[in-house]
Amino acid sequence: MRRQVRSKKAAALKALEDGDKVLVVDDFHYIDKGIQIQIVRSLKQLIFDGLRVVFLAVPHRAYDAVRVEREMTARVTQISIPYWSQDELRLIAEKGASALNVEIAGNDIHEFAEEAFGSPHLMQRFCHSLCINNEVRETLEKKRILSTDDKERFFGSIAVDTAKSAFERLAKGPRARSDRIQREFRTGETGDIYYGVLKAIAASGPKTTLSYEEIRQRFKEILIGDVPQAHEITRVIQKMSGIAKEDLQGEPVLDWDEEESRLHLVDPFFAYYLKWGELVPRESADG
């Protein structure tokens, strides 16, 4: 069987060598590190000989190919696809308003762009909700001005449909052998360390990239009493990253970079929920 696998691998590499094609490896960042090493090392000589390979990955994992094989350092060029800029996001609202013959009042467009976390989909959600709330469903004959009177209520109502289930699953954590310690927060509620970590992340803004030190500092600011030990916080972040990859549908909402000790909020909808959603503590899995 091993010989058969080896022969298939050799045949695949031979086909790549002989054909004038570009090899594309999608979602490279999701592949287990050990498999990443095998892939890169198998392709390394062909790449040195001129084979063109594209590894598609989220921005903070763009150099995984170099991390697993240092000899690739001078052979990798990153082509970045950034989040949408504020100007690009505002254009969505401006063009939509023009098409519907409406005007968006005051500073609303600017605020929409700021709250979208670089996501055109969130920007479209804001515009859609604005129209529905003002009963605009088609192009108007007479121009109207649309506004959001209560910003907290407006953004909060949208948060319910973004990433509530992801938050609840991460706050629940893995199955525990015993009840987790409940901690008291300055906002009045109590919750375990999983809820605390999410609340600490939210307290950062949330920022979409946080170092371990930033998360721990935010924990100190929101908690009454002693902060959990460093290894406890790190363990929880690692567990959350695993849950995000294995238990949640679709793309993981967050990702912990072990080497850099940085947490990345990959999903703009999740970041948005942490800012505007109702962060309710949950009981641990067994208690």
Describe the function of each predicted region.
Residues 32-35, 85-89, 229-232:
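Phosphate/oxyanion-binding active-site loops and adjacent basic polyanion-contact surfaces
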Residues 3-60, 67-70:
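Conserved Walker B catalytic segment
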Residues 106-169:
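Amphipathic alpha-helical "lid/sensor" segments that cap RecA-like P-loop NTPase cores
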Residues 67-83:
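A short helix-turn-beta junction within AAA+ P-loop NTPase domains corresponding to the substrate/partner-engaging
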Residues 30, 59-63, 85-89, 130-131, ...:
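Conserved nucleotide-binding/hydrolysis micro-motifs of P-loop NTPases
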Residues 146-287:
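C-terminal leucine-rich, beta-strand-based interaction scaffolds used for sensing/assembly
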Residues 81-109, 117, 121, 125-128:
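Conserved small helical "lid"/interfacial subdomain of P-loop NTPases
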